């Protein structure tokens, strides 16, 4: 009987990571999904991550507590206003969480090595994104090289691969591929500054990119938004 490969998928509960979860699951690998409670103000996404994991058979899901809010430095984890009027494309926005993807991937790598898994999946995107440095292809390439230099598995000839299936897709293309795979986008949240019920503000950069993506895909966004 052939050995079933295993993979660790970073699952935030947002649109992109829910799509990546389905993509990874479709490969037939044994999927381990990892989410983080890191002090973010948009914690509703963790409930969405739980529901996304439960929607697929055989997915093991863990939520790890990691208080990046202790460091501050981001509008997502500190008392800093979330921009609502667009962002300057020439600067890194205040919604950037210092080294977040480096931290998340490092922990996913540690779990993968303990599981004997050689595949990591992350929903970074370099097309419709907000200018975060840890969403670029060069960062992913560098991390994969580091992963294989820094681990027992890597030096013993069992290298890791970091998969970024969304890296060159527009938000509309991501949505179209996700719908084809059966993603329920009503069970995802993207807003940086939602209300207490998890409804999106419709004005932050995450909401703007999401709404634009659904409009370009020609389908309505099923997530709730604040309004009169």
Curated annotation (Swiss-Prot):
Catalyzed reactions:
7-carboxy-7-deazaguanine + NH4(+) + ATP = 7-cyano-7-deazaguanine + ADP + phosphate + H2O + H(+)
Residues the record lists as binding ATP: 11-21
Record InterPro entries: QueC, Rossmann-like_a/b/a_fold
Q: How is the cofactor bound?
A: Binds 1 zinc ion per subunit.
One GO MF term attached to the UniProt entry:
ligase activity, forming carbon-nitrogen bonds
What's this protein's function?
A: Catalyzes the ATP-dependent conversion of 7-carboxy-7-deazaguanine (CDG) to 7-cyano-7-deazaguanine (preQ(0)).
Return the similarity comment: Belongs to the QueC family.
Q: What is this protein called?
A: 7-cyano-7-deazaguanine synthase
Species of origin reads Magnetococcus marinus (strain ATCC BAA-1437 / JCM 17883 / MC-1)
Q: Which gene encodes it?
A: queC
